[in-house]
């Protein structure tokens, strides 16, 4: 918290001292549009040097994704006090577009969530994650060859190492020029507090026994062209032990797929019960797969509750289960399902504990070493 506070104070002090011109587009009735974390309690912090420590420690800006105020962006607010404009500078002000440097990750252990998120407090929210709450979730896209810096969303993924992302194999079929985006939260805006990192995927390694139909061993590793830099909003998750079981536990799944028929802009957060293999097989038979269907060993099931389910667009996203110590491990990867959110129709996930040895072998093959234990 002290590091985060320091970064915010430095950002604000620089902003105030710069005397940058406030462009007309940032004006609003009675003030200027600034990022909400720069305007606590409705007024700009214009005297940082004399601000009470208690005013800044634990500072959190309330958010409502349906509240666009006069600034046409829910991450901005019309602030009643702002730095005085000058007549000479033409630079774009730091109040709305410049990102503060994220505090470095001082805890190098894997599986550490930012419980409750960072900086923002998203209100009136039941199925969306807080900002940076789950720092291992990855947004994977395919670059458009005809358009620079533009890409199409492909699937979700999970950071397990500074050079490795794990996802589903079927989502990478036929895909080239993949890029892994770290630190993403709301895909509809670029005004999040901390910068994202986009890193090219150098290699896709699919499980050697992967089969699309009937789907089996639906897991793939994305080898990054360079290491991702860990920060408070970008950290890896732990891998489970091969003997770990999660039946009966409620675990968290995240992604940007459909919810009630509409793709999510803000990363979702759904808490789902993990269901035993026999029970899941029975449910899937009744859901339409017939009396002879049996769930394969490489999968697990979660969900089965009405209108609470991962859906189209969530493939490759994580199912993270919390251990008694509070650490999160990657229990599953969203693979397939029958519809979305049907009663007694759970979603099917890759059972990561069945593939830990395979993942371990490739980490060793890549000669990738971390300074923390990734629970292999």
From Swiss-Prot:
Localization in the cell:
Secreted
Q: Which PROSITE patterns match?
A: TRYPSIN_DOM
**Which Pfam families does the entry link to?**
Trypsin
Instruction: Give the Peptidase S1 domain ranges.
Output: 114-364
According to the record, the residues making up region (Disordered) are: 85-106
Q: Out of the domains of life, which is the source?
A: Eukaryota
- Post-translational modification (record): Secreted as a full-length protein. Proteolytically cleaved into two chains which probably remain covalently linked. Cleavage is induced by fungus B.bassiana and Gram-positive or Gram-negative bacteria infection.
Q: Where is the signal peptide, in residue numbers?
A: 1-19
Record carries keyword rRNA-binding? no
According to UniProt, residues marked as the site described as Cleavage are 60-61
> Molecular function terms in GO for this entry?
serine-type endopeptidase activity
Q: What does this protein do?
A: Inactive serine protease which plays an essential role in the innate immune response against bacteria, fungi and protozoa infection by activating the melanization cascade. In the melanization cascade, acts downstream of TEP1, SPCLIP1 and CLIPA8 to promote CLIPC9 proteolytic cleavage. In the susceptible strain G3, appears to be dispensable for parasite P.berghei ookinete elimination which occurs by lysis. Required for the melanization of Gram-positive and Gram-negative bacteria. Required for the melanization of fungus B.bassiana.
Which family does the similarity line name? Belongs to the peptidase S1 family. CLIP subfamily.
Instruction: Name the chain's protein.
Output: Inactive CLIP domain-containing serine protease A28
Q: Which organism is it from?
A: Anopheles gambiae
């Amino acid at each position: 918290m002290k590091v985060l506070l320091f970064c915010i104070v430095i950002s604000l002090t620089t902003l105030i001292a710069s005397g940058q011109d406030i462009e007309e587009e940032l004006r609003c009735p009675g003030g200027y549009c600034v990022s909400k974390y720069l305007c606590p309690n409705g007024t700009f912090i214009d005297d940082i040097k004399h601000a009470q420590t208690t005013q800044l420690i634990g500072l959190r800006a309330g958010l409502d994704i349906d509240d666009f105020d006069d600034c046409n962006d829910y991450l901005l607010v019309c602030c009643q006090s702002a730095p005085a404009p000058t007549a000479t500078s033409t630079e774009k002000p730091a109040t709305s577009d410049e990102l503060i440097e994220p505090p470095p990750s001082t805890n190098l252990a894997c599986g550490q969530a930012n419980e409750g998120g960072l900086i923002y407090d998203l209100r009136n929210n039941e199925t969306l994650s807080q900002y940076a709450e789950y720092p291992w979730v990855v947004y994977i896209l395919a670059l458009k060859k005809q358009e620079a810096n533009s890409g199409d969303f492909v699937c979700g993924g999970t950071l397990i190492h500074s050079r490795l992302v794990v996802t589903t194999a079927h989502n990478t079929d036929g895909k080239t020029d993949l890029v892994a985006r770290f630190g993403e939260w709301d895909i509809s805006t670029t005004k999040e507090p901390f910068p994202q990192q986009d890193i090219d995927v150098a290699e896709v390694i699919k499980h050697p026994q992967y089969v699309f139909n009937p789907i089996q061993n639906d897991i793939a590793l994305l080898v990054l062209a360079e290491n991702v830099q860990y920060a408070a909003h970008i950290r890896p998750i732990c891998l489970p032990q091969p003997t770990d079981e999660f039946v009966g536990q409620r675990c968290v799944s995240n992604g940007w797929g459909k919810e009630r028929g509409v793709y999510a802009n803000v990363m979702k957060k759904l808490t789902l019960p993990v269901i035993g293999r026999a029970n899941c097989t029975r449910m899937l038979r009744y859901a339409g797969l017939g009396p002879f269907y049996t769930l394969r060993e490489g999968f697990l099931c979660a969900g089965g509750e009405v209108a609470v389910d991962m859906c189209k667009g969530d493939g490759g996203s994580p199912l993270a289960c919390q251990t008694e110590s509070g650490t999160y491990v990657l229990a599953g990867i969203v693979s397939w399902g029958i519809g979305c959110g049907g009663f007694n129709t759970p979603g099917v996930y890759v059972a990561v504990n069945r593939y830990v040895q395979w993942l371990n072998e490739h980490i060793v093959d890549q000669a990738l070493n971390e300074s923390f234990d990734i629970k292999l």
